[in-house]
C-alpha cells in the first residue's frame, strides 16, 4: 500500500504535514501556509462536525478523488459517506486530463497496473458505495 504510486503524489511538505490523516472536504477554514496556499484546513462546510478536514487545491481535486477511489477498491478500504460525496463531485468537476493519463502510463511501466478510474472515468458512477 505505502509504495503504490497510484496514490502517492509529490506535494509541498508543509501542506502534507498539515493534512495529516484528515478526511477530504470543502471547508470553512484557513489556507495552509507555505507553498500551497490553495489548500485549506478547517471544518466541513456541509456538516456541523467540529472535526478538521483538508481541502486540496481545485486543480487537483479530481486527481485526489480518482486516487482515493483506486485505493478504496484496490485495498478494500471504505471511504466515509461524507468524503465520498465530495470525491464524486470533484471527479466530475476536474476531469481526467492528458497529464494524469500520462502519469497512469508511466506508473503502469513501473508497477504493471493501472488506475482504472483514469482509464474509465465513467466507472465511479457504476459503483454505489466505495
Indicate residue ranges for each PLM-predicted region.
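Domain-level detector of nuclease and nuclease-like folds
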Residues: 1-130
Amino acid at each position: 500500500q505505502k509504495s503504490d504510486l497510484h496514490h502517492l503524489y509529490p506535494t509541498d511538505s508543509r501542506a502534507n504535514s498539515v493534512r495529516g490523516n484528515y478526511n477530504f472536504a470543502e471547508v470553512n477554514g484557513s489556507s495552509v501556509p507555505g507553498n500551497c496556499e490553495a489548500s485549506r484546513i478547517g471544518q466541513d462546510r456541509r456538516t456541523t462536525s467540529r472535526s478538521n478536514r483538508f481541502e486540496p487545491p481545485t486543480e487537483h481535486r479530481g486527481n485526489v478523488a480518482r486516487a482515493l477511489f483506486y485505493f478504496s477498491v484496490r485495498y478494500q478500504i471504505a471511504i466515509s459517506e461524507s468524503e465520498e460525496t465530495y470525491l464524486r463531485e470533484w471527479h466530475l468537476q476536474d476531469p481526467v486530463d492528458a497529464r494524469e493519463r500520462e502519469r497512469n502510463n508511466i506508473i503502469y511501466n513501473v508497477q504493471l497496473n493501472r488506475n482504472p478510474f483514469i482509464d474509465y472515468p465513467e466507472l465511479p458512477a457504476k459503483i454505489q458505495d466505495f
